Amino acid sequence: MKNKKYLSVFNEIVKLQSKGKLADGIQDIKLEDMDEDMLKGYICSAMNQEPDTGASLKDIAKQALNESEASHPIISVVGNCSECIKKDEKELKCVSSCPFDAIFKDSQAGRIRVDADKCEGCGECVKACSLERIVDKIQYMPIVNLLKDKKVPVYATIAPAYIGQFGDEVTPGKMRTALK
């Protein structure tokens, strides 16, 4: 994952969750030089939640702690796209990069949006957004909740898309060793 700020937010969420303090400590996550709207978007997306529901971070964290299924789309647009929304849709790299026409400009809302019915989660828009306002939701919480449940066996496979998700130093060989 190239977005170091997003990864930093995710690391803070994992720390809070592992201590059992996610719901109570979620609003204490702060990043320098980041507006609250974008930070909330990063926090929500890192917990596999939608950022613009209007709910408090504490309520969103509680919902994430009880979730056992991944949601769709796996792509979120976070923060304010005011710099981009002024441009013609043909000029927007995120829109033109999507092979499924799932990213579009919502001029009324002043945002870039994801059409959940069209999005296949390829991540091309994530790579195309130089402002790091489009991120892939992290499916960590549903997996942790399934593993904790222990009512049914959990089997997992790893997709090739994991490459780069854990930093450049995590190679496929290291991943195979870790999963054994």
Residue ranges, per PLM feature:
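Short, functional N-terminal and low-complexity linear motifs
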Residues: K62-L65, A109-V114, I143-K148
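Short amphipathic alpha-helical segments, especially helix-boundary/capping motifs
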Residues: A70-H72, A116-E120, K151-A156
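N-terminal [4Fe-4S]-dependent radical SAM core
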Residues: A55-K105
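Short, charged N-terminal helix-start/capping segments
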Residues: L39-E69, K93-C94, E120-V126, P160-Y162, ...
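Iron-sulfur-associated redox domains of electron-transfer enzymes in respiratory
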Residues: M1-E50, K137-K180
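Iron-sulfur cluster-binding cysteine motifs and their immediate structural context
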Residues: E83-D115, E120, E124-Y140
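Short, contiguous strand/loop micro-motifs
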Residues: C81-S82, I112-R113, A161-F166
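Generic signal for short, ordered secondary-structure residues
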Residues: S76-V77, Q108, C122, I158
